[in-house]
Amino acid sequence: MPTDLPLSVWPTAQQTSRAQRSGRYLALSTAHPAKMLPAIAATAIAAYTEPGDLVVDPMCGIGTTLVEAVHQGRDAIGVEYEERWANVARANVEFARSQGASGSAEVVRGDARQLASIIDPAVRGLVALVITSPPYGPSVHGQANPKPGGGVTKWDHRYSTDPKNLAHRPLEDLLDGFTSILDQCRELLRPGGFVAVTARPWRRDGELIDLPAQVLRCGEAAGLIPFERNVALLAGLRDDSIVPRVSFFQLGQVRKARKGGLPLLAIAHEDLLVLRRPK
């Protein structure tokens, strides 16, 4: 990870993820296994765009980027590979509009690796900001309930089983695919436009996968220039302490690692890496 990038800390978890979505997103959204915190998307949109600008999310999931964009008077386009989540994203956008959001948004069903053939070519060179997040290994969110007598029941903790989904591809394929997506995003951006990517490290068979550093390399390979690094907190700030907001699955991974002798700590932030199209 470069050490010379400007660095900021964003207090994006002053409320729990549930509180951030309550009354703003439909209940159907809960089932997605890896949702971006609304405050992260909202803060990025406020920082890198102006009202009336166009925002794109090539892997939009339940439409968090789109919802936060239209609530701030921006227009948005989202691409989603899985039909289930594309439908939820559309419903969330309609819900936002019913609440008075002034921006407009479109959800396109398709594979972001074919972004150039999916999105209307008329917007090429007009996009102010791309926000997205690559799939990041096993640390998805999901739902869980303890069973009587021990154990837990898990649900909504995995992506679909479609082998073409980037979430199921080997790391090398994931990075190649993400580089291709960023390359096509660069063509959509206006000169000086921004790409903001959330990423966090994860472990595979005990080995640390430094996804944030890999994301920067993908961006540079796609012709983008690293601009800023923002620490988007996943824990609340209270005076001189933090309030952990660790998911059941993240806590389980930490406990399992510690039992195996690996001194793992729960992650309290995501990197929001900002790159820029040359002017």
Task: Identify the residue ranges that each predicted region occupies.
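Class I S-adenosyl-L-methionine-dependent methyltransferase catalytic core
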Residues: 1-279
